[in-house]
Regions:
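Compact, glycine-rich, soluble single-domain proteins
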Residues: 1-60, 65-67
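Acidic/glycine-rich phosphate/pyrophosphate-binding loops and surrounding catalytic core
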Residues: 49-106
Length: 106
């Protein structure tokens, strides 16, 4: 019987393998929180997408747009830190979607 140490942590956008009732799923998580208690783990995700619900072309386009925004922001002193963080979050969400679809990204 597995027991976990207590933990509450923020989740960044990423690909996550979730096992529930003996079934394993690969899911693109758009950020959120995870609470670990001795007997269970609870994930409160901003968004969660299964591979069959991900549009690859849309994810690739979002990835490219976010990369372009980040590169242009780095060369522009006018851009605010929040704009850069938003672009980085969009890039991470797109990357998670592509990884869940088994498409390699940088």
């Amino acid at each position: 019987d597995l027991k976990h140490a207590r933990l509450l942590t923020e989740l960044i956008p990423h690909a996550m393998r979730i096992k529930s009732e003996g079934t394993e799923h690969l899911v693109a998580i758009g950020g959120g929180f995870m609470e670990v208690t001795p007997d269970k783990i609870t994930i409160l995700a901003d968004s969660a997408e299964l591979p069959e619900n991900i549009d690859v072309d849309r994810a690739k386009s979002a990835y490219k747009r976010a990369e372009d925004r980040i590169n242009s922001y780095k060369n522009s002193p006018k851009e605010s830190e929040i704009d850069i963080r938003r672009a980085e979050a969009a890039l991470a969400r797109a990357k998670a979607r592509l990884l869940v679809k088994n498409i390699p990204v940088n």
